[in-house]
């Protein structure tokens, strides 16, 4: 779609730093959205306004404008280069659908096009974007055109640690319910604070899911927020087990350790999941489940059995601070190098 001279002028204006006392000009040119001026980052191709501080890419901004039936912005974003077909995933009135057609949209989207739009829209990991994705795709009949297995593959890939090592999603037959958990998990994985609070306030029945995701994705900040402030609790040994699911989860493992979780059991769990860095971290904290770990492995796993067979390990001599303050934990473990891992790596095995 060829842009008009007026839309090009607006695009240039949106890229300028307009003083507050001249914001009335932006209102006159319809460069106003969610109680604030629209700005356009020409380098990143991001649309921003008061309610979308992190920004949305042009296609995603179009999806939002279509969902809100904001005709002026639909036309503007389309002229600025947004793909008008993206608007078809969020269209909710015939008038808006007609407008999209006038601007060049197809009659309908096929399965591959819908799936590609879904993949594209969820790419940017910001609070604004994840909340919008949830609002657009929740109970959206357009997803009925997409093969259920293909959709689940897209979702499961980013949640593979939880899928492979827990049964938390095994009985989630509803795609809408699965998508809700997916968006919530992504918010926690990338520590999107506004999105986390949005889901927490709106879906209190998923409190345990929030705690689980914080543990699995090593988000010690949200773990502390959920556990201490919001009083979302579960058995401490189960918390440690979930923290051990994914390797390098030192922060959430340490949080559970300070709360009183059994460090020998954590070592066993790490061994069973073949998470070597987690295992060495447990040794640093005083775990000594070498014999039990070897037995738990069964056949195979030669490397880890060799590690466990050596009598060269001992607890770290420099103790970590006994605190559940996430700032302290994050600072202490940001560049952590396991003492026992270094002992093994420098040990002469000949």
UniProtKB/Swiss-Prot annotation:
Protein purpose: Plays a role in virus cell tropism, and may be required for efficient virus replication in macrophages.
Record bears the keyword Transmembrane: no
Record-level GO BP terms: taxis
Electron transport among keywords: no
Record protein name field: Protein MGF 360-12L
Pfam families: ASFV_360 (PF01671)
ANK repeats: 57-89
Record's keyword terms, sorted: ANK repeat
Family: Belongs to the asfivirus MGF 360 family.
Naturally occurring in which organism (per UniProt): African swine fever virus (isolate Warthog/Namibia/Wart80/1980)
Superkingdom classification of source: Viruses
């Amino acid at each position: 779609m060829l842009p008009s001279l007026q839309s090009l002028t607006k695009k240039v204006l949106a890229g300028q730093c307009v003083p507050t006392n001249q914001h009335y000009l932006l209102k006159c040119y319809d460069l106003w959205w969610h109680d604030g001026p629209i700005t356009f980052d020409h380098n990143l191709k991001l649309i921003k306004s008061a309610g979308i501080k992190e920004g949305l890419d042009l296609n995603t901004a179009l999806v939002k404008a279509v969902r809100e039936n904001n005709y002026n912005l639909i036309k503007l974003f389309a002229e600025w280069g947004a793909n008008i077909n993206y608007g078809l995933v969020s269209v909710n009135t015939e008038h808006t659908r007609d407008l999209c057609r006038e601007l060049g949209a197809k009659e309908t989207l096929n399965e591959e096009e819908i799936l590609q739009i879904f993949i594209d829209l969820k790419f940017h990991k910001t609070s604004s974007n994840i909340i919008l994705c949830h609002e657009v795709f929740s109970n959206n009949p357009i997803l009925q055109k997409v093969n259920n297995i293909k959709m689940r593959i897209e979702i499961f890939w980013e949640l593979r640690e939880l899928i492979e090592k827990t049964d938390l999603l095994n009985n989630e037959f509803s795609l809408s319910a699965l998508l809700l958990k997916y968006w919530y998990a992504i918010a926690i994985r990338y520590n999107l604070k506004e999105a986390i609070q949005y889901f927490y306030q709106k879906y209190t029945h998923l409190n345990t899911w929030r705690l689980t995701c914080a543990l699995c994705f090593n988000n010690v900040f949200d773990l502390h927020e959920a556990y201490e402030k919001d009083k979302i609790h579960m058995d401490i040994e189960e918390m440690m087990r979930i923290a051990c699911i994914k390797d390098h989860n030192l922060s959430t493992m340490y949080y559970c350790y300070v709360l009183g979780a059994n460090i020998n059991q954590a070592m066993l769990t790490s061994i069973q999941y073949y998470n070597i860095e987690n295992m060495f971290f447990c040794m640093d904290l005083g775990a000594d489940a070498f014999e039990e770990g070897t037995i738990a492995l069964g056949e195979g796993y030669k490397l880890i059995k060799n590690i466990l067979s050596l009598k060269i390990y001992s607890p770290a001599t420099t103790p970590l601070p006994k605190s559940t303050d996430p700032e302290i934990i994050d600072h202490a473990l940001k560049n952590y190098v396991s003492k026992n891992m270094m002992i093994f790596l420098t040990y002469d095995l000949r």
